[in-house]
Amino acid sequence: MSVEATDPDFKRAIELIDAGDCVALAKMLDAHPRLLVDRVPVADDAAGAYFANPKLIWFVAENPVRNGTLPDNIANVVIAIIEAARKHAVAELKADLDYTLALVASGRVARETGAQEPLIQVLTGA
């Protein structure tokens, strides 16, 4: 499924999530904290209503499937996003984590790659 960000900053942040580049992602979120709160402008609504106007953190779930895989360090990527959200006092962090948790729990890629349990632990422990 194609979920293509139209904003270049969001597109780059999603690429960093997909690459598992925690350091570059943390720097980007520090430089552009709006990425933590804004909805990702996407080219169309091909992903359906449950992923309409997604938040950046939702992309860690790989649900809907975009690449069919997750980086080995995806739990650390989530930690980097959570730390940035706390640093920038993101008011809706709890709601964002809850929705991300639902995407992780219901997604096949996280389950099939062995990332589901570590992601659930990070998301529920935050």
Q: Model-predicted segments: where are they?
A:
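Ankyrin-repeat boundary/"N-cap" motif
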Residues: E4-E15, D38-R66, A89-G114
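Short coil/turn connectors between adjacent alpha-helices in alpha-solenoid helical repeat scaffolds
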Residues: V23, A61-A75, A105-G125
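Ankyrin repeat domain, specifically the short helix-to-loop turn at the C-terminus of the second helix
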Residues: K27-D38, N73-H88, I120-A126
